[in-house]
Amino acid sequence: MERSIVLAADVEADRARVFEVLSTTGGQRAFWTTDCDVSADKARFGFPQAPMDLLADVTTEPGKLVRMHVTSGFPFWTGSTWEWELREPARAETGTGVLFRHYGFAEGYAEIDLGHTAQTWAQIMERLAAYVASGSPQPFFPASS
């Protein structure tokens, strides 16, 4: 069985703003991890307790999609892809619908680990929604002290 994660949220911001946040270093630092660098075609994500960084190839469709394909990093993540697809909101009158997918984990990724990963991504999605609505950064992985 292929292991994948799918999450959805309607956020209180227009597509251009959500796309900017998802596709830039400043945006990613505001809701996910302060230790990152994102360019038009590459990204690096670091985490306080992780022994290695995640490196990813980035592809985008402005206003529609931000996709990151892992080229090296955590066990079972190399070769996986996460993406944010932007669309009309599904359950709100205004804003942007964000459909998040993470798929392509390596064979052997334990179901319990996938569950923990899904829970973490859900919390990161909440941070994204809060940031695009308020403009107040609250990264899930802040800088280590």
Question: For the regions a protein language model found, what residue spans apply to each?
Answer:
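Generic structural signal for secondary-structure transition and capping sites
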Residues: 16, 27, 65-66, 133, ...
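Short, surface-exposed coil-to-beta transition loops
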Residues: 4-6, 51-55, 77-83
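Hydrophobic pocket/interface hotspot
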Residues: 18-22, 28, 43-45, 57, ...
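Beta-strand/loop substructures that line and gate deep hydrophobic ligand-binding cavities in soluble
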Residues: 73-123, 128-130, 139-141
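Short strand-connecting beta-turns/loops that link adjacent beta-strands
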Residues: 14, 50, 61-63, 89-94
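Short, flexible loop/turn segments with low-complexity composition
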Residues: 135-145
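Hydrophobic ligand-binding cavity/cleft-lining segments
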Residues: 1-37
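Glycine-rich portal/gate segments that line the openings of hydrophobic small-molecule binding cavities
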Residues: 26-74
